[in-house]
């Protein structure tokens, strides 16, 4: 972010705690390009309204966002160890939602990570599993709106796109949520921008 800001003279937006945590690693940023967005707030940027909300993760002031434009909205919620009421309240009206589907629990348990990292990933301030992502989508779908859901932040070590998708589909099928009719489900590519 620091390199982009310096090269293209663009601002960096972050809440105060996140800014303080990353300030040294960014390098020198022009004062006018330092933009503090208070936690749990809404700000307008041109014709976009951007709302931040807390996400339970073991990083400094982890945050998700909902962006509204001309009556439409999109949300991003990653780095969430637990799907909370605050997250649901902030994303349930969005037409497009990028939601974390980070790992398969068994792959974490039997994978190469050291014990402490496994415990961290699986904790309530770690990352959302594929099954918990499916359960979160069930909660989102209780709000009667056709949505596009993008599964994102898939672990390279503890997940496989097909496994993430199938785990979520299994949960949705168990709750009689019809993919294609009730919602569109996509996977974000790990290494390139989505065409969604």
Per-segment meaning from a language model:
Residues 7-12, 73-74, 183-184:
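Short active-site oxyanion
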Residues 17, 55-58, 78-80, 101-103, ...:
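Active-site metal-binding loops of divalent metal-dependent hydrolases
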Residues 22-25, 45-47, 62-63, 107-110:
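Short, charged, surface-exposed secondary-structure boundary motifs
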Residues 38-96, 196:
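Core dinuclear metal-dependent hydrolase active-site scaffold
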Residues 85-186:
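Cap/insert and terminal regions of metallo-dependent hydrolase folds
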Residues 183-196:
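Short, basic/aromatic-enriched C-terminal tail that caps enzymatic domains
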């Amino acid at each position: 972010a620091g390199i982009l800001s310096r090269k293209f003279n663009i601002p960096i937006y972050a809440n105060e705690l996140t800014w303080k945590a990353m300030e040294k690693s960014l390098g020198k940023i022009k004062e006018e390009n330092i933009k503090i967005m208070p936690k749990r707030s809404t700000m307008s940027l041109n014709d976009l309204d951007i709302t931040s909300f807390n996400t339970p993760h073991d990083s400094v002031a982890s945050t998700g966002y909902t962006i509204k434009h001309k009556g439409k909205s999109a949300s991003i919620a990653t780095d969430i160890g637990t799907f909370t009421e605050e997250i649901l309240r902030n994303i349930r009206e969005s037409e497009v939602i990028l939601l974390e589907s980070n790992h398969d629990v068994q792959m974490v348990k039997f994978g190469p990570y050291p014990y402490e990292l496994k415990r961290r990933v699986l904790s309530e301030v770690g990352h959302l599993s594929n099954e918990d992502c499916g359960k979160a989508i069930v909660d989102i779908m209780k709000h009667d709106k056709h949505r596009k859901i993008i599964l994102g932040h898939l672990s390279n070590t503890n997940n496989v796109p097909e496994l993430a998708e199938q785990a979520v589909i299994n949960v949705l099928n168990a709750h009689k949520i019809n993919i294609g009719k009730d919602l569109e489900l996509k996977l974000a590519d790990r290494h390139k921008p989505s065409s969604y």
